[in-house]
Regions:
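Conserved catalytic alpha/beta core of Sir2/sirtuin-type deacylases, generalized to analogous enzyme cores
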Residues: 2-116
């Protein structure tokens, strides 16, 4: 993959911060961001909101996918939007509140920008 970034210090290929092994970083910054995110969710609990999921697979669905589905089902004003190259889907319970686009995320975003 030609676009993979490399560490400027040691030259090793960089990876995403995923809960797949012992390299996941859950430091002070992670907890600060987590608290801000939870505060945002509480403040917008029953308001009009779009839960936008970009490229989330089934590696750790309990982190993003399942909570988005749950929050959408509990809020009639919510819309669950998923853009994924191969795994764009939602449960039947929230189908009427969902937009699932199975396509390349970059192309979808370029198309949206071109339509403005």
């Amino acid at each position: 993959y030609k676009r993979q970034p490399y560490c400027p210090h040691c030259g090793a290929p960089m990876t995403m911060n995923l809960r797949i092994d012992g390299t996941f970083v859950q430091d002070e910054g992670w907890y600060y961001a987590s608290n801000r995110y939870n505060d945002f969710l509480k403040r917008h609990e029953n308001l009009k909101i779009v839960y936008l999921e970009l490229g989330v697979g089934n590696n750790t669905p309990v982190i993003i996918k399942y909570p988005f589905w749950d929050m959408t089902s509990k809020n009639k004003n919510a819309v669950y939007t998923c853009i994924n190259y191969q795994e764009a889907f939602c449960p039947p319970q929230i189908k009427k509140q969902s937009i699932c686009i199975q396509a390349d995320i970059g192309k979808v975003l370029r198309d949206l920008q071109a339509d403005k």
